[in-house]
Curated annotation (Swiss-Prot), chains A, B:
Gene: asnS
First-tier enzyme category under EC: ligase
SUPFAM superfamilies per UniProt: Class II aaRS and biotin synthetases, Nucleic acid-binding proteins
Native source species: Azobacteroides pseudotrichonymphae genomovar. CFP2
Protein name per the record: Asparagine--tRNA ligase
Taxonomic lineage from the root: Bacteria, Pseudomonadati, Bacteroidota, Bacteroidia, Bacteroidales
MF term (GO), any: nucleic acid binding
Amino acid sequence: MKMKRARIVDLLSTPDFNRKVCVKGWVRTRRGNKNISFIELNDGSTVHGIQIVVNVVKLGEDSLKSITTGACIAINGLLVKSKGEGQKVEIQADEIEIYGIADPSVYPLQKKWHSLEFLREIAYLRPRTNTFGCILRIRHHLAYAIHKYFNKQGFFYFHTPIITSSDAEGAGSMFQITDLDIANCPKTKDGEVDYTRDFFGCSTNLTVSGQLEGELGALALGGIYTFGPIFRAEKSNTPRHLAEFWMIEPEIAFYDINDNMDLAEDFLKYIISYAMKYCKDDIEFLNNTYNNELIEHLNFVLSNRFVRLAYSEGIRILEQSNEEFEFPIYWGIDLQSEHERYLVEKYFKCPVIMTNYPKDIKSFYMKQNDDGRTVRGMDVLFPRIGEIIGGSERESDHQKLLKRIKELNMSMDNLWWYLDTRRFGTAPHSGFGLGFERLVLFVTGMQNIRDVIPFPRTPKNAEF
Amino acid sequence: MKMKRARIVDLLSTPDFNRKVCVKGWVRTRRGNKNISFIELNDGSTVHGIQIVVNVVKLGEDSLKSITTGACIAINGLLVKSKGEGQKVEIQADEIEIYGIADPSVYPLQKKWHSLEFLREIAYLRPRTNTFGCILRIRHHLAYAIHKYFNKQGFFYFHTPIITSSDAEGAGSMFQITDLDIANCPKTKDGEVDYTRDFFGCSTNLTVSGQLEGELGALALGGIYTFGPIFRAEKSNTPRHLAEFWMIEPEIAFYDINDNMDLAEDFLKYIISYAMKYCKDDIEFLNNTYNNELIEHLNFVLSNRFVRLAYSEGIRILEQSNEEFEFPIYWGIDLQSEHERYLVEKYFKCPVIMTNYPKDIKSFYMKQNDDGRTVRGMDVLFPRIGEIIGGSERESDHQKLLKRIKELNMSMDNLWWYLDTRRFGTAPHSGFGLGFERLVLFVTGMQNIRDVIPFPRTPKNAEF
């Protein structure tokens, strides 16, 4: 078929009827009788299919036999206003070409309700469903909005390394990378693995955060952001954990904790409103199919100013509440999800940015307050999912940073370069991390993080 | 300093003089006498510094002592038209705050010429140099242009997995990933590594290409693209090889090889012209400092239509040329860089897209031509660097694909899901891969691929 293919999303919104068009896509359903057949065709450009009307007598019954759910076809026909209900336009087929059949006796995606659990097992096919089409389009638009936002701010996309010889947080389970034959590792005289013979000449891991390298970028280019894959070798089989996920980490020179909070709020509101504008149909589909509070939650974030709340004040509010919590409340605890949700959903009824955490529950690199016991960390707390962003102003004073590292008995052998940034032209700076899948969960309203990434990596699963 | 910080790139182009401004950045140089001091300040937003004029008597000589190359400072002052040559505006300082000193006796980046080799050793500091500032800003704008282009085409950013249990090309050196204790691996009764006890329950590697998973996306969403890190465990210590690099792989349903070639040409022209527009100063700096043919090369690509050239015709031209080549020419060879450059730089004098390669030098998944000996692969050949893009129309026929796999004695145990796309609703489709660093090399005019990524990973080097 030589006519230029039109995307269905464009045809559904065109005011320009009564013209010949060509569409190509996958059959969702076919129904009808011996005279007329209706095909719902989807090409992935939108959750909505376009209706193809086929004159069975004219095109021949035989040509329709293999047009079953999942088959791939091309249609030339006339685009007309639809007489039927439920759609605005339809195509009267002149010509049909079959690219690929999908034998109903073996094709797993038939026209019926498939559970999300079942679809997870056939992750290689699930992008062809309406649900995952919606999720993946939203995922795209969120990613695009993130680049657009930071580009507009004048921040530069900075590729921090995936393979690393240092551990960004002084903790965390990491995957090891090697090109040694692990069945038969070369050993040193002491019986240790001889890493001088490994590809990089040392032991290497998959990164758990790009922040420390990101700081190097910020202290040179002013403002940077990362957007790349991050890995955790935690054997947590939960709806909230992935071994491989994507993370966004802006880092900005000359930003203090207040600038950082303002940025986080503005950023989240921008990307969520972008998604609501450009993924309207997809969000509506998910709202109506899975989670009828979804749009409400999104508007909740957009229409409220995020409350700034010191940790100590948060503890006071929780202590004085009459709520029964599973975990006890006292100054020094790491807040649990139940506490965060109480503050956001019941007490303030708006997103909360909590700051000035006890230093003992936060990372070594956070800027120390003068009180000697708190640091300028910040967590952005959302309804339903709790923490969506974690960040801080960074300790820019070389001596204070060294002292804290000593207190924590950390080895900084592999991080001398990080400390050097505080020796050479140090500057106040801040940043935060946003787990991309956490964001996609929030904007799609899905419950399981394995449903918002194309090919989830979890314990015992690296398929496709 | 409570005044809002202005970015130097904005001040250098403002028509709005004689107002108080605040700038923050790193000192490139300071010179002057006992009455007046000139500081060149850079904040990473542009390659150009802004000149700060300091009345030494007014601000006190002592306050200036630690303002040496690399120090980080904040300035409040009056933005005025410059009387000096070489700059349009300058700032008359009212107030200076020192954020961080950079002791000249230890700070490695002094005001002198540093070789690229030396800067590679201090990769953690080199973003602070003019050269790497330019490269990294260009890198950002190219990445942004890529997202912008595909978004406009209606293609969706699709995250293919980094950790994989399959080898995309049936070849290639891969890094292994594990959370086993490799010094003491669990073994099966047969003495093999017991991968059932590894994190994913099987042997896993870092991906060498997202293409195969990308095809799953394209055959559901219509058009997708990937942009993520790719890994090769090849011990090649050359200016063209990295163990970790970034790759862009669009994959589009219903595109044939001609659509694919048109897309590749339009795409490359778009992103290169975007860079020339948004990175004008940076490209000029690199042109004038390292490679005075850079801008010429970029214009060469923009102003010429890319020639479409069948491999067989290319061989004929090479055979009939009077050029002396190191490697012999005959039908069936994989072209060498010298051949590609002859065709591009001497014969056609324009970029070339070569197609219809002998099947034996290309991958199993390329669409087979009717002649039984060629496939619909395509390489885009550029001046100076040779192949910048490699792609193909994919074999969409299940039987032909199976037959080819058998011919090649490939094991497809881990790729049943890939074959399934040809069983269920298969469609003609095409795609290509662009090595991002190869592109950045071309647009920056740099010679060594280690100089166009922030933290290069190469044999024996995973530092920072």
